[in-house]
Structures are given as C-alpha cells and as structure tokens.
Amino acid sequence: MSEELAQKTEELSLDSKTVFDSKEEFNAKHPLNSRWTLWYTKPQTNKSENWHDLLKPVITFSSVEEFWGIYNSIPPANQLPLKSDYHLFKEGIRPEWEDEANSKGGKWQFSFNKKSEVNPIINDLWLRGLLAVIGETIEDEENEVNGIVLNIRKQAYRVGIWTKDCDESKLKTVGERLKKVLQLNDEQKVEFMSHDASNTRGAEPQIVL
C-alpha cells in the first residue's frame, strides 16, 4: 500500500496533464501572490538512498485553481506512508536547511504524539495550514514564511512552518497566527526552533506558545 501511494505521488511530477487536462475548466484563474512548489519525500527503501534521493519536486503552481487541482489529485495526509513528507515551498526554495533562504531561519511546529489523535483531524489541519501559507495570511508583508511541511512518523505527526530568519518579533506573530489557523486550544502548544538548534541534541525550543 505504501509503495502504491508513493508511486501515485511521484507520477504527478511526470506530466502536469494528470492534474489539469481541461483548458476550458481552468481558463479563468485567480493568481496567487507567489508561485509555489510541492515536494514529496518518499520513505527510504534501502540504506543507500540519502535525503537528496528521496526528496523530489512534484509540481509548481501559481493560482487558486491549480492548487485545488493538485490537492484533490494527491493522497490525503492521513493516507501517506510512514517516514514520508509533504513540503510546500515558494518556488526556488528547496525544503532543506542548507538552502540559502532557509539557512538563517527555523520552524514553528505542532506535533501530535498519538496516532489515534491524528487521523480524524490531520487532513483538516494540513489543509488549513496550506491555505494560510499560499494566501500569505500567516505573515505580514515581510515575506517571512518560506513554506510548510507535513511529517508522517511512527511516534509523531508534525505540521511545521519554515521561516527565513529568527527575528523573535516577527516569529511570535507567525506562531500566534499558526495556532489560530489550526484552531488549537491553550493547552496545545506550537514550538519554534532554529535550524541550527535542531542540529544540537537535546536542544530546547526557543519559543513556545
């Protein structure tokens, strides 16, 4: 089943016509402020595969209609195999710490620790996050957000917002809006950690909201 889902996702990058096959249907488009690229990390099948082998761009889009065509054509969040990821980043930015646009930044993250807690709502949370990011309503005009990530893991399912820097005054606004977008309660916390700190074992988050 995992291989089937991974194959379905990979096939989207082979031919954009698998998503859009009607010029008439998508003739009237509502452009987004930025162009976005969807990436997919497939689960590792052998130890010789590294991160770069597993991370693949799927498709780039620039309108509301294109977004919905893609979203409705790929496996939903709760059907992704373990150790896979979705990444939605502004065009030209790879979802890697080493990318110049990400190297001085970090990520806001919300984690689910129990699988039973995730499945009924993860699709809804992921969609809310996607819409906030492509609509650029989760940030002010500083162009602070680079992308959004969904990680599927055995012990934790995570939704994360990647930022271009670690300016705390800007970060708090993004974190507060993320909580609002995901409709989290006061007991459900989002945490920010810089990418540099994430490389340090046992590092604590810099901000918790």
UniProtKB/Swiss-Prot annotation:
PANTHER family: EUKARYOTIC TRANSLATION INITIATION FACTOR 4E RELATED, EUKARYOTIC TRANSLATION INITIATION FACTOR 4E1-RELATED. MRNA binds at W51, H52, W97, E98, R153, K154, Q155, A156, Y157, R158. InterPro entries: TIF_eIF4e-like, TIF_eIF_4E, TIF_eIF_4E_CS. Recognizes and binds the 7-methylguanosine-containing mRNA cap during an early step in the initiation of protein synthesis and facilitates ribosome binding by inducing the unwinding of the mRNAs secondary structures. This is Eukaryotic translation initiation factor 4E. eIF4F is a multi-subunit complex, the composition of which varies with external and internal environmental conditions. It is composed of at least eIF4A, eIF4E and eIF4G. eIF4E is also known to interact with other partners. GO terms for biological process: nuclear-transcribed mRNA catabolic process, nonsense-mediated decay; positive regulation of formation of translation preinitiation complex; regulation of cell cycle; translational initiation. GO terms for cellular component: cytoplasmic stress granule; eukaryotic translation initiation factor 4F complex; nucleus. Belongs to the eukaryotic initiation factor 4E family. The gene is TIF45. One of its GO terms (molecular function) is phosphatidylinositol-3-phosphate binding.
